[in-house]
């Protein structure tokens, strides 16, 4: 595997571990120093392909292959236009065709295949579906807001749980110190034997530990269905697909041999007399004597009637 490096100044990460590689829309890599040198005015051409680039569009290379970074950025731009969802299509087949079209566009733009026709196709689609694109953008914005709100609620719950646990630990320490101090005071002032005082102290410590270990009731945050309290759910009807139902057809296998008895008949016909009975451990793993015997008979009978042609 070739060591990563800048193709212009030939600096590699082996010689400079702090080397920061940058990539732009064309997918060619430059180090941060070369970017600052070549794009002093804020814009310039790629030294490899000559594509006009802006300095502000350079970003840190995340993947070893810069083509992957290029594809990620192209996919983001394409999905901003082709943002339809499954519920926008009357059938699953049309939705799958739409996804295949998106993948074809991303592939063409990433690998510089038929760029003019691909870009023209995107412009036509954007003009014809302007309203749908805007509606899905607003829908996506609402979903992002709901997601951020849910994350914020979860963060607050985690913070409250952390503070509650911290408070409980502090309370436990205080109670233990009080119990210890009470025991020392009794040793100083009481006339009872030390063994009796020690036994009483152990009893109180045990009761205190049991009280502290008793689980506190947790306030429910979700319903029994798994839906979080306060969460708004969509009640829109689900699109029904009018398709033919699946019909099971038994598997027909030509074994060129005698007919093998059914599983239920093996015991009556005496096939299981000399087969090891299944133990409880075998049954737990899915093994049954009749199934093993049935498989063995299939192997034994297979090909007995076969004749070379």
Swiss-Prot record:
Q: Does the keyword Transcription apply?
A: yes
Q: What are the BP-aspect GO terms?
A: adult heart development; DNA repair; G1/S transition of mitotic cell cycle; negative regulation of apoptotic process; nucleotide-excision repair; positive regulation of smooth muscle cell proliferation; regulation of G1/S transition of mitotic cell cycle; regulation of transcription by RNA polymerase II
Q: What is this protein called?
A: CDK-activating kinase assembly factor MAT1
ZnF RING-type residues are 6-50
Q: Which PROSITE patterns would you find in this protein's record?
A: UIM, ZF_RING_1, ZF_RING_2
Sites of Phosphoserine modification: 279
* Transcription is among the record's keywords: yes
**Which Gene Ontology cellular-component terms appear in the entry?**
CAK-ERCC2 complex; cyclin-dependent protein kinase holoenzyme complex; nucleoplasm; transcription factor TFIIH core complex; transcription factor TFIIH holo complex; transcription factor TFIIK complex
List keywords of the entry alphabetically.
Acetylation, Cell cycle, Metal-binding, Nucleus, Phosphoprotein, Transcription, Transcription regulation, Zinc, Zinc-finger
Report where it is expressed, by tissue: Highest levels in colon and testis. Moderate levels are present thymus, prostate, ovary, and small intestine. The lowest levels are found in spleen and leukocytes.
Question: Gene name, please?
Answer: MNAT1
Assembly state and interactors? Associates primarily with CDK7 and cyclin H to form the CAK complex. CAK can further associate with the core-TFIIH to form the TFIIH basal transcription factor.
SMART domains the record matches: RING
Please give the chief subcellular localization of this protein.
nucleus
Where does the UIM domain lie?
Answer: 142-161
Positions modified as Phosphothreonine?
A: 51
Q: Which InterPro entries match?
A: Cdk-activating_kinase_MAT1_cen, MAT1/Tfb3, UIM_dom, Znf_RING, Znf_RING/FYVE/PHD, Znf_RING_CS
Q: What are the protein's GO molecular function terms?
A: cyclin-dependent protein serine/threonine kinase activator activity; zinc ion binding
What CDD domains is this protein classified in? Answer: RING-HC_MAT1
- Please explain the role this protein plays, according to its UniProt record: Stabilizes the cyclin H-CDK7 complex to form a functional CDK-activating kinase (CAK) enzymatic complex. CAK activates the cyclin-associated kinases CDK1, CDK2, CDK4 and CDK6 by threonine phosphorylation. CAK complexed to the core-TFIIH basal transcription factor activates RNA polymerase II by serine phosphorylation of the repetitive C-terminal domain (CTD) of its large subunit (POLR2A), allowing its escape from the promoter and elongation of the transcripts. Involved in cell cycle control and in RNA transcription by RNA polymerase II.
State the compartments where it is located.
Nucleus
Sites where N-acetylmethionine occurs are at 1
Q: Which residues form the signal peptide?
A: none
